[in-house]
Curated annotation (Swiss-Prot):
Task performed by this protein: IGPS catalyzes the conversion of PRFAR and glutamine to IGP, AICAR and glutamate. The HisF subunit catalyzes the cyclization activity that produces IGP and AICAR from PRFAR using the ammonia provided by the HisH subunit.
One cellular component (GO) term of this entry: cytoplasm
Originating species: Blochmanniella floridana
Enzyme class, UniProt record, top EC level: lyase
Gene: hisF
Subunit and interaction comment: Heterodimer of HisH and HisF.
Protein name in the entry: Imidazole glycerol phosphate synthase subunit HisF
Lineage: Bacteria, Pseudomonadati, Pseudomonadota, Gammaproteobacteria, Enterobacterales
Active-site positions on this chain: D11, D130
Residue stretches spanning the membrane: none
Length: 258
């Protein structure tokens, strides 16, 4: 059995780590390089960096901070933000990232997933999904350009259909961001994650809702995800990664201790 992964998420604007609630009302948390170094030393299994304004502003993530992070941490990290071509993806990997993640660019051009997988290998290609539950319609809507509330828009994709399509194109991993839970700290969307897990044959990372150590245990036990991504609880030091890992090990979860 592969060890479950604990993954701090760092949303980035102008080289600063920020955090909001339900993808809005962002507050500055701190310096991106310092926080990356801190989480690496704390025992994170990997890090994910989202330049959340890149795609909405037709920009690409800054290679400068990617290179700086590669110099100061010794764990894998994934980078997302406006990566819409093979050349851009290669550049990010060349500057030190282990994986690249695409979200809005994949929605705009699904064949990009296959192109990246064919040239870089599936192990390097992550697809992020931002899903918002519309209670009136009773469906999970896939959002595009979710980093900028003024440009964010719903797509015509149903969540499950998009998950299946992503896999057919050759994605190596999916990060499923449940937007309703984002920053709320009231637990992951176990019901929906469990449903998606049944149709997902590649690694699935849960995102949105972590508030306690029990929430991590629940998402591993009930949704059988491969990794749990979180931001607020780590940034605010509500949960320390080494303490979380010790708790999970005592509960029988296979996890790496650093």
């Amino acid at each position: 059995m592969l060890a479950k992964r604990i993954i701090p998420c760092l949303d980035v604007i102008n080289n600063q780590v920020i955090k909001g609630i339900q993808f809005q009302n962002h507050q500055i948390i701190g310096d991106i390089v310092s926080l990356a170094q801190y989480y690496s030393q704390e025992g994170a299994d990997e890090l994910v960096f989202y330049d959340i304004m890149a795609s909405p502003n037709n920009q690409t993530v800054s290679k400068k901070w990617v290179a700086k992070i590669a110099e100061v941490i010794n764990i894998p990290f994934c980078v997302a933000g406006g990566i819409s071509t093979l050349y851009q993806a290669k550049e990010i990997l060349k500057f030190g990232a282990d994986k690249i993640s695409i979200n809005s660019p994949a929605l705009l051009n699904p064949s990009l997933i296959q192109k990246l997988a064919d040239h870089l290998g599936t192990q390097c290609v992550v697809v992020g999904i931002d899903a918002w539950y519309n209670a009136q319609l009773g469906t999970y809507q896939i959002k595009c350009f979710s980093g900028n509330s003024s440009r964010m828009q719903s797509t015509t994709w149903e969540l499950l259909d998009w998950v299946i399509q992503i896999q057919q194109y050759g994605a190596g991993e999916i990060v499923l961001n449940m937007m309703n839970q984002d920053g709320m700290q009231n637990g992951y969307d176990l019901k929906q994650l469990s449903k998606i897990r049944k149709h997902c044959t590649i690694p699935l990372i849960a995102s949105g809702g972590a508030g306690t150590a029990q929430h991590f245990l629940d998402v591993f036990q009930y949704a059988d995800v491969d990794g749990a991504l979180a931001a607020s609880v780590f940034h605010k030091k509500i949960i320390k990664i080494n303490e979380l890992k010790n708790f999970l090990i005592k509960q029988g979860v296979e996890i790496r201790l650093c």
